[in-house]
């Protein structure tokens, strides 16, 4: 992988194979996607497929549901993505992966499931607040726990400037 250029719906990737420089379109969000795609392409080629055949279908690849998935496009041009990140590292990676594709603010809507590891909740909030421009904290399957307490655990150590809290997930979104 030599270079990538990003836009709101994907990326152009520039890579070398067998001494030839290729430029191909990936309709996938996140720089890491190019690395994954090229690794998969190398495996397919190593199993006997023709490189040109493999490279010519890269633009047809689609993301896995719930992973950097384009869910909607707003009338104002904003894109809405879904990623089921559920750890601090995954939230940080997801938001950072979006940044090159975004020409305005990133608004992250996050929550934490109930009856799960409570120690990661403040870290999830911190990861979101350090990487997004605005963070909206909402409920995400609280199970047997009090949803308000889960939200408070996520936001307890955060500056309130760009943090919003909504118990109703639909309202938050």
Identify the residue ranges that each predicted region occupies.
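C-terminal helical cap/extension that packs against the catalytic core
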Residues: 124-173
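Nucleotide phosphate-binding/pyrophosphate-handling subdomain across enzymes
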Residues: 8, 17-134, 160-162
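Short, positively charged
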Residues: 15-17, 155
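Short, solvent-exposed polar/charged micro-motifs at secondary-structure junctions
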Residues: 1-4, 79, 173
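Conserved phosphate-donor/acceptor-positioning beta-strand/loop module used by diverse small-molecule
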Residues: 3, 83, 138
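A short, compositionally biased
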Residues: 4-12
